[in-house]
A protein has these predicted regions:
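A short loop-to-beta-strand scaffold at the N-terminal edge of the catalytic core in hydrolase folds
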Residues: 28-37
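Active-site loop/oxyanion-hole signature of alpha/beta-hydrolase fold enzymes
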Residues: 30, 74-123, 133, 138-139, ...
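Conserved HGGG/HGGXW glycine-rich cap/lid loop of the alpha/beta-hydrolase fold
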Residues: 36-88, 106
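Active-site glycine-rich loops that stabilize anionic/oxyanionic intermediates
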Residues: 51-54, 122-123, 152
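Flexible "cap/lid" loop of the alpha/beta hydrolase fold
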Residues: 133, 137-183
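Conserved alpha/beta-hydrolase catalytic His-Asp/Glu region
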Residues: 181-246
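Conserved serine/cysteine hydrolase catalytic core
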Residues: 225-273, 282
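Catalytic histidine-centered segment of alpha/beta-hydrolase-like enzymes
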Residues: 262, 283-299
């Protein structure tokens, strides 16, 4: 990255620098970075899966809260392939199903016993649903709850801002990104200084600290073009209705911002119809970036689910 893009990333604050453990898991030749807080032998592990063009760092407000509130719970975060510190494979190797496989590889390596709660934000929502659908029975039996944040169980391009991905113009843009990646980087570099104010309009609907908006913009800028292109088709067409049968036993929450333009309320209501045990909650006046924009809503959902499970025996 050069110029404005480099400056955007250089000046941003770094998070998850004080983790208890960190490492990499090999997933068919792709290294997936993971981060842990809390005891390795914890009875309950909360797994947090971030969204498209983000990274595990996007949950820093949740880890800060949960470490203080629930010191006996283990927190496991990871950078999805193509994001953060994980390897950046080719566009053809980026999809929701492959990302879910990566998560399952990390869980198989790191979480051998105890209850598991899975939280997915944005693209991490469909990825977490795919994890549930693909999980081996032994792991599925230990899943004790789930939280879907600004998520979708149907195609992301079916409604909201994501419909832009299904237009002819978007296809032309992504064809250009795929065919001329070096030119794409130059284009992205030239507009990097404009990203933050655009995000303030499109993603953040509540008044939000400028540092958090610039942090979000920097994460997007740090995402390689091949990752943007690779997940493009799945963002348009991927759906996880096949995961619905495995949701039926689980308690949990579906959270959505009242003014979310990316995954509108209708998407969360659709999840709720497939998952009758979930509590559907709307963050008043908020947009798509609830972990940063409305962190108390996300923290409260995890807190309530942990308290709900506190009296239940672990497996």
């Amino acid at each position: 990255m050069l110029g404005r893009g480099r400056a955007l990333s250089k000046r941003r604050k770094r998070y998850l620098t004080d983790v208890d453990r960190r490492g990499f898991t090999d997933s068919h030749g792709v290294r997936i970075a993971w981060y842990e807080y809390g005891p390795e032998d914890a009875e309950t592990t909360v797994v947090l899966i971030h969204g498209y063009t983000l990274a595990a760092e996007s949950f820093h407000l949740q880890t800060e809260y949960l470490r203080k509130r629930w010191p006996g719970v283990r927190l496991l975060l990871m950078d999805l392939r193509g994001h953060g510190m994980s390897d950046k494979p080719s566009a053809a190797q980026c999809s929701v199903d492959v990302a879910a496989h990566d998560v399952l590889r990390v869980l198989a390596e790191r979480v051998h016993t105890g209850r598991v709660i899975v939280l997915g934000h944005s693209l991490g929502g469909p990825v977490s649903l795919a994890v549930l659908r693909r999980a081996p029975q032994e792991l599925y039996d230990r899943v004790a709850g789930m939280i879907q944040v600004s998520s979708a169980i149907e195609e992301l391009a079916a409604a909201g801002l994501a419909r832009i991905l299904n237009t002819k113009t978007a296809h032309l843009v992504f064809d250009f990104l795929h065919a001329k990646p070096r030119g794409a980087w130059r284009l992205r570099e030239r507009i990097a200084g404009l990203i933050a104010p655009v995000l303030a309009i499109g993603f953040f609907m509540r008044e939000t600290d400028d540092e958090l908006i610039e942090f979000h913009a920097a994460l997007i800028n740090e995402t390689p073009t091949r990752t943007l292109v690779g997940f493009f088709d799945d963002l348009r067409v991927h759906q996880e209705l096949a995961a619905a049968p495995r949701l039926q036993k689980l308690p949990g929450f579906v959270l959505v911002g009242q003014k979310d333009l990316v995954t509108p309320i209708a998407q969360s209501e659709r999840i709720g119809r497939e998952w009758p045990k979930a509590w559907l909650q709307m963050a008043h006046g908020a947009g798509h970036m609830l972990p940063l924009e409305a962190p108390k809503s996300v923290n409260a959902a995890v807190d309530r689910l942990l308290r709900h499970l506190a009296g239940a025996p672990s497996r």
